[in-house]
A protein has these predicted regions:
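N-terminal leader/linker segments that initiate helical-solenoid repeat arrays
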Residues: 7-51, 55-65
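Terminal, low-structured helical/coil segments at or just beyond the last alpha-helical repeat
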Residues: 17-19, 195, 201-239
Length: 239
């Protein structure tokens, strides 16, 4: 096992781009080892300690903190991690306002904060979330994740605050058209169909997830999306 001093020595000797790639690979393969997520964080933080304006490391570390928040125990820890993820994304926006991932991961972490606090306690966040989603798609019209973000927003909001299952489904379909193997979007589409009691359509979306080959985000698929799809299949069986 590497000592901390040995790790630091290796990191300071490595090329920044190689470090970013290594950290990215650890994150994308975190389903293979429970320690990879933390290791990814350490490497991205090392890059930023040497190069605080590294745009790739900023948005990627924001993504890492979103995942760290998702798996944290207790709302206090979750919120602290999402807040730091949002801060990192905001730093990127200030460096390069035209980087779509800065806006996207600011939105994701802000949205997670809202989900953790509860929708009714977070309605004041909605204009900011919409603004960041709109800007993400202005900068990258093919951003499937932003389409999922719009769909999730319309899915989760109560009707009096602008929620709409029809709009949610429309946005989820747009995202799937852009990236058919982005497994989370198909799960979210199925959940919207279930809420509308459109069970045959939900079943079809879930079958696609369960049988998906070469998902865009393998770790998300294995750790979250396929298990949730299987769970939802059981819940609506016979309906």
């Amino acid at each position: 096992m590497l000592t901390i001093a040995g790790l630091v020595s290796i990191l300071t000797a490595a090329d920044t781009n190689a470090l970013v790639k290594q950290a990215t690979d650890l994150y994308l393969n975190r389903h293979q080892n429970s320690g990879y997520l933390e290791q990814s964080k350490v490497l991205f933080e090392k890059v930023l300690s040497q190069e605080p304006t590294n745009q790739e490391a900023l948005w990627q570390l924001s993504r890492v903190y979103s995942s760290l928040g998702d798996c944290a125990q207790g709302n206090k820890t979750k919120l602290a991690r999402y807040e730091w993820g949002k801060t990192l994304a905001d730093s990127l926006i200030k460096i390069n306002e035209r980087h779509p991932e800065g806006h996207f991961w600011f939105m994701v972490n802000q949205g997670r904060i809202g989900q953790t606090r509860g929708v009714l306690n977070s309605l004041f966040m909605v204009p900011t979330i919409k603004k960041e989603l709109k800007r993400t798609l202005e900068l990258n019209p093919n951003h499937a994740g932003a389409c999922d973000g719009w769909g999730s927003l319309y899915y989760e909001l109560p009707g009096f605050a602008g929620g709409s299952l029809d709009k949610a489904i429309e946005w989820f379909k747009k995202g799937i058209a852009l990236d058919p193997t982005y497994s989370l979007i198909s799960v979210d589409l199925a959940k919207a169909y279930i809420k509308k009691k459109m069970f045959p359509e939900a079943c079809a979306a879930l079958v696609i997830v369960v049988n998906m080959q070469n998902p865009t985000y393998v770790a998300d698929y294995i750790m979250d999306d396929k298990p949730e799809a299987l769970k939802l299949q059981k819940e609506i069986e016979g309906k």
